Amino acid sequence: MNSFALLLVCIQACLVQSVFSQCTSRAAVAADRGIIGGYGLGAPYGLGCGYGLEAPYGWAGYADYGYGLDAYGGIGEGNVAVAGELPVAGTTAVAGQVPIMGAVKFGGDVCAAGSVSIAGKCDCGCGEVYGYGLGAPYLY
């Protein structure tokens, strides 16, 4: 390998390190949900398995319709799972409509300091308790 090729490899390594250092930190590598954790690179939601980049549903946010590279990344229905800590400090305000059809369930402790209020009404016009009717496959 000549010196010019070695220089290009070193520059490429610096560029890759610069790009990935913006997304991850030292804590992300060793944390519970980090690179080596349950949702890391080798986990069911990692790069090569399940819903990862190489999976049938991977790259879903980059295209218009269908599955894979043609998947739509805007509106959908299904389960949303959040694991880990979600620290929120300060005031969070949501203006506009937040349509939720289905059930919202919290599992575990939800610690909040101060006052938490949720006000609104269901105006989806579906006429069913969970929005999709009693024949829906997933009622939680």
Curated annotation (Swiss-Prot):
Instruction: Enumerate the UniProt keywords alphabetically.
Output: Repeat, Signal
Q: Which Pfam families match?
A: Chorion_1 (PF01723)
- InterPro entries in the record: Chorion
Q: Where is the signal peptide?
A: 1-21
**What's an example GO BP annotation here?**
chorion-containing eggshell formation
Q: Name one GO molecular function term.
A: structural constituent of egg chorion
Gene Ontology CC annotation, any one: egg chorion
Q: What does this protein do?
A: This protein is one of many from the eggshell of the gypsy moth.
Say which family it is in: Belongs to the chorion protein family.
Question: What is the protein named?
Answer: Chorion class A protein Ld2/Ld41
| Native species | Lymantria dispar
- What phylogenetic lineage does the species belong to? Eukaryota, Metazoa, Ecdysozoa, Arthropoda, Hexapoda
